[in-house]
Amino acid sequence: MTADIIYIYSDGACKGNPGAGGWGALLVAGGHRKEISGGEPNTTNNRMEMTAVIRALELLKRPSTVEVHTDSQYVQKGVSEWLPGWKRRNWRTADGKPVKNQDLWQQLDALSQQHRIVWKWVRGHAGHPENERADVLANQGVLQARQY
């Protein structure tokens, strides 16, 4: 890992879909690590996956080079492939339907424009230590959400 790159490992979890959900992220830069997590009582897995990345990017104090590792193809493909078309079509899908989670996509889009980001999809639960940690944090968020 290079010290000038901020690595973000994110995950979302949902018990029921919709249901109680949690998100977690691990940020690694140089020798520093920061863990964040949270939850919502009634949400979806995709909203939690997106929230994990949003909350991590919100912590960055200045424009940075970032590598986001997510096991969510929805997030990775959404940002890398689908977002430009949605914006061109005024937040409509290719078949004219409103984009789901538009509020979060707009937040993620705005935050992404502040940084140089490489989006990397990783297979979930494949033994990658940082992504496994993000999964633990997301499940802690589910437990927090169930207490509401």
From Swiss-Prot:
The keyword Nuclease applies. SUPFAM superfamilies: Ribonuclease H-like. Binds 1 Mg(2+) ion per subunit. May bind a second metal ion at a regulatory site, or after substrate binding. PROSITE patterns: RNASE_H_1. It catalyses: Endonucleolytic cleavage to 5'-phosphomonoester. GO terms for biological process: DNA replication, removal of RNA primer. Residues 2-143 form the RNase H type-1 domain. Belongs to the RNase H family. This is Ribonuclease H. It comes from Thiobacillus denitrificans (strain ATCC 25259 / T1).
